[in-house]
A protein has these predicted regions:
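NAD(P)+-binding Rossmann beta1-loop-alpha1 motif at the extreme N-terminus of oxidoreductases
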Residues: 1-62
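Anion (oxyanion) recognition and catalysis
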Residues: 20, 40, 109, 150, ...
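Rossmann-fold dinucleotide-binding core
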Residues: 95-173
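Helical "substrate-binding/catalytic lid" subdomain
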Residues: 164-275
Length: 275
């Protein structure tokens, strides 16, 4: 089995490096040549185009930022689908929404190509091989992806048919967003009540309310947190809002958090421009 990986950004780089470290010798491609040049001496094959990755690899992991970037790699000039062979498996790691992967699976099936819906969660855990990979799709293509997934995943969880993994990831990220908003509120309340912030961070980070947003807030504050996290969380909450869903408190709180983060981002930028 030959493997390929496209999408050497913040999330994809440690995933590809785990594949290299495990001896899979993946075919790699990046839009910027300087990114690909970092792997000149690595145990990997460097492709000139996405089409070359498709011509050489049986299983290809795609970790692009969004649907537009994924489409560009698949269908653009010298894209994957210009050279993909029947039986090729595409593992879609980007968070792009259920409709996108369902449409993609139907579209590439006419070429004999398979899609595995496989968004990831965990961020920095990729470098340690401890990502959560949420998978959906047919068993045989999933099985072919397993050796690749095992290099960067601590857990691989199957949740159903194509689109179910995207839906699960969107629920996960909506919950993260909502929790983040409540963490902001908790610290704002603590300030109003005169509680020392480091002490409150220790309480919230050590007790029953502990969650990943608390230590991040404690380290960088709400404004910097918003600067860093807003683009991705905004994208994912917008995907949730595009679904035909009943009204839920989860989505309402997530939406309110995105609006609050946008205000905090603007305030932060304004404060920096006047100093």
């Amino acid at each position: 089995m030959t493997y390929g990986f496209i999408g050497l950004g913040h999330q994809g780089t440690p995933m590809a490096e785990r594949m290299i470290g495990a001896g899979l010798r993946p075919w790699l491609w990046a839009r910027r040549s300087e990114v690909l040049d970092r792997y000149a001496d690595a145990d990997a094959e460097l492709a000139a185009t996405p089409a070359q990755v498709a011509a050489e690899a049986d299983v290809i992991g795609l970790c692009m930022y969004d649907a537009d970037a994924t489409d560009a790699v698949l269908w653009g000039p010298d894209g994957i689908m210009s050279a993909a062979r029947a039986g090729t498996v595409l593992a879609i790691h980007a968070t792009v929404g259920p409709a996108y992967v369902q449409d993609l699976a139907a579209r590439v099936a006419t070429h004999g190509v398979h899609v595995v819906d496989a968004p990831v969660s965990g961020g920095p855990a990729a470098a340690e091989g401890k990502l959560l990979v949420i998978v959906a799709g047919d068993e045989e293509p999933r099985a072919r992806c397993t050796p690749m997934f095992e290099t960067y995943a601590g857990r691989v969880v199957h949740v159903g048919g194509i689109g179910a993994a995207q839906a699960a990831k969107l629920i996960n990220n909506s919950l993260i967003t909502a929790i983040t908003g409540l963490v902001f509120d908790a610290f704002d309340l603590g300030t109003a009540l005169g509680i020392e912030q480091d002490g409150l961070a220790d309480v919230l980070g050590s007790g029953s309310a502990a969650n990943p947003s608390v230590p991040v807030y404690a380290a960088i504050g709400a404004e910097e947190f918003s600067i860093r996290a807003w683009p991705t969380l905004h994208k994912d909450v917008a995907l949730v809002e595009s679904l035909d869903l009943p009204a839920t408190q989860l989505v309402d709180v997530a939406r309110a958090t995105i609006a609050d983060m946008e205000i905090r981002r603007a305030d932060y930028v304004a404060s920096r421009s006047t100093t």
